[in-house]
């Protein structure tokens, strides 16, 4: 089985001020890969990997994926942060599958992020159920 398209929905923390609601991400970066002190690579670049950024379109938002919950300002210049979109987008590129990504802005990636996330998950799911009817 190979799907023709993968649609990812999840929550994200806003880095860009004023970002709210459900947004579509079209550019994906690995925000916590950092070997700059060891190799001549940029933040987000993985050694021996030729895919370091994924750009599906110039429209949409920049998403930085990582393994940690963000509760303070980060160094990478992205609009929002999550924990899975980069990996999903990369698998889709490698397998030749169309990828779309929608994120509900659940928090502002600050010190209140974890409590805001819990409160906003249900609201985001309800809004995405409405949005998916437009596909």
Regions found by a protein language model. Name each.
Residues 1-135:
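Glycine-rich phosphate- or other oxyanion-binding loops that anchor nucleotides, phosphorylated ligands
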């Amino acid at each position: 089985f190979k799907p023709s398209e993968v649609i990812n929905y999840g929550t994200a923390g806003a880095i860009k001020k004023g970002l709210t609601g459900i947004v579509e991400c079209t550019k994906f970066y690995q925000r916590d890969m950092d070997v700059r002190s060891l190799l001549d690579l940029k933040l987000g670049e993985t050694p021996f990997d030729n895919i370091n950024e994924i750009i599906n379109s110039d429209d949409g938002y920049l998403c930085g994926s990582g393994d940690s919950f963000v509760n303070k300002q980060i160094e990478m210049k992205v609009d929002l942060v999550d924990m899975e979109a980069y990996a999903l987008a990369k698998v889709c590129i490698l397998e030749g599958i169309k990828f779309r990504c929608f994120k509900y802005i659940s928090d502002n990636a600050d010190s209140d992020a974890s409590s805001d996330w819990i409160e906003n998950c249900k609201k985001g799911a309800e809004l995405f159920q409405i949005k998916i009817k437009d596909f």
